[in-house]
A protein has these predicted regions:
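GHKL/Bergerat-fold ATPase module
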Residues: 1-201
């Protein structure tokens, strides 16, 4: 992983680049732009704007806003599903584009490794780290094979994030799967009647 910082008008954006490169051009196979600002020597995570595409092949891929993660991925090796640049090919048709679909999946997997390594090494130094934990893929896609791919991707990222200490408590961060929360009905009832809290505590 190579870390780059690029200056914007009011903060620094962090980019992670794969050490694996494209043979012909020497470019990184994948670049991940993290939703992390460097402000006054502090790393602060933030939510990307809902209108920012998450996938790029030099230019943004249309319709990839809210793709499923709070990161931006770029690869010169990505292959679009159509010439219209509106989606990546993650499912082949059993003919000539299966190789493209598998390559796109492997690039996303490489990005996953890069992001996971960065989070593992740096999470304790990132404020508002919960913004790194967004996982919300479109699981109700009309293409069943694509929906299954997104389900497996979602399951993989959720399982990984459950093992990271994203949950902030007054005693420090705890691993996500260790967090316990009130049932919504119980929570609402406790807001209305504070005496109910004695049964909980």
């Amino acid at each position: 992983i190579d870390k780059c910082e690029t200056e914007s008008c009011d903060f620094t954006v962090l980019m992670l680049q794969s050490k694996e490169t494209v043979e012909e051009s020497g470019e990184p196979k994948v670049i991940v732009i993290l939703p992390i600002k460097e402000l006054e020597s502090k790393s602060v995570a933030f939510a990307l704007s809902k209108d920012v595409p998450n996938l790029f092949i030099y230019l943004p891929l249309l319709g990839t806003e809210q793709w499923g993660l709070n990161f931006i991925f770029h690869s010169p090796l990505f292959t679009c599903d159509k010439d219209s640049r509106d989606s990546l090919r993650f499912v082949g048709n059993g003919q000539n584009n299966d190789v493209d679909a598998e390559r796109n999946k492997s690039i996303i997997q490489l990005a996953d490794v890069i992001v996971s390594h960065y989070i593992t090494e740096n999470l304790s130094n990132i404020q508002d780290c919960m913004y790194l934990a967004k996982v919300a893929f479109n699981l109700h896609n009309s293409d069943e094979a694509l929906a299954n791919y997104y389900k497996s991707l979602q399951s993989s990222w959720v399982k990984k994030y459950e093992s990271f200490p994203f949950v902030i408590t007054k005693n420090g961060n705890i691993i996500t799967r260790q967090a316990k929360v009130f049932d919504k009905e119980l929570f609402d009832a406790c807001l209305e009647n504070k005496d109910l809290l004695t049964a909980v505590y």
